[in-house]
Amino acid sequence: MLCHRIAKGFMGHADSRDMLEIEIKAPCKDLVKLEKNLVKLGARDFGTLVQADVYYAHPARDFGKTDEALRVRTENDLTVITYKGPKLDQDSKTREELEVSVANVGTISSILERLGFRPVLKVAKRRKVYGLRGVSVCLDRVDGLGDYVEFEYEGEELEAGKAIIKRLMGDLGVEGNERRSYLELILAQGRN
């Protein structure tokens, strides 16, 4: 969600409270080539972020079974806590996301732990953000996983949003679709 929030301020999106955030992610073999293709198509560069995400386990239910997540993300001076609901379809990573900025990562972590939540895993990544055709394109280098590209579009209609993203993916030569989160991918590596 943060990727899209950075870019949407520059792309003229209205208030997004009733909008869906439609996401499709794919592995990327060559981030440099993809970045060059984005620039050729006229994408706007919104900069590079270094993100550290800590995912938490609920004290009374298994988020793995309910397809939910609770994440505390830190980047630069910003800390955001995000609840992610179950995925809404079989093709994308689209899900309800509720988030709020917090002033202090240490305080929010202590609050969660005192409530019985426990940290499960930390995911660190370097994210380069572009905007093109109303889509946020995030080029991610994830520690321990490799390179991915994530497309995010905000709109009222799921199918229309997926079509916009898939058209852009085709124009960029991006294939594949990884519905699992970075957390799920890292946890799966540990099971193999």
Protein language model regions, located:
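N-terminal strand-loop-strand beta-hairpin
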Residues: 16-134, 171-192
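Residues forming anionic-ligand binding surfaces in small-molecule and nucleic-acid pockets
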Residues: 84, 142-148
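Short beta-strand/turn micro-motifs at beta-sheet edges
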Residues: 137-139
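Long, well-ordered alpha-helical scaffolding segments within enzyme catalytic domains
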Residues: 159-176
